[in-house]
Amino acid sequence: MDIAHDLQSIGAQEQALVFPHFDPARAWALGNRMHALATSRGHAIAIDIVTFGQPLFYAALAGATPDNADWVRRKRNVVAHFRRSSYAIGLRMQQAGATLADKHGLPIAEYSPHGGSFPLTVAGAGVIGSITASGLPQRADHEFVVEALCAELGHDYAVLALARS
């Protein structure tokens, strides 16, 4: 895995995966798309879609645990704080040889810079929330969310996917 290349690719994902508008009905449709995709693959994950301050969709699939819900919360907090994907922030910390606690004073009990939470961005408004998955390895959590967003927004996932490691 090439961290610099992944960070560049994640930046392209974040720029491309922007909704023209977003409302609770769109959150429900996206959440159900993610649920169906995860179910078809046998993923034991938790899925969470929020605008900052308001939950819009949550599902814990068979095999997901309360620990997944806590990972969702902590990853979501990273997106809320930095307005970037949790995986990008984690890779930046890895690149710098630092932690969120060291560099930003953010406690590990509340913030997790692991892959799986992606900014929910609306054209003309910016980042308004997050879409999060937890239960797979962090890179797979991140890519699961990106794949679902590509399908929802009509983008070719093969073009935006991270390079295979």
Curated annotation (Swiss-Prot):
Signal peptide: none
Pfam families: HbpS-like
Cross-referenced InterPro entries: PduO/GlcC-like, PduO/GlcC-like_sf, YBR137W-like
Family to which this protein belongs: Belongs to the UPF0303 family.
Protein name: UPF0303 protein Bcep18194_A4700
Organism of provenance: Burkholderia lata (strain ATCC 17760 / DSM 23089 / LMG 22485 / NCIMB 9086 / R18194 / 383)
Organism lineage string: Bacteria, Pseudomonadati, Pseudomonadota, Betaproteobacteria, Burkholderiales
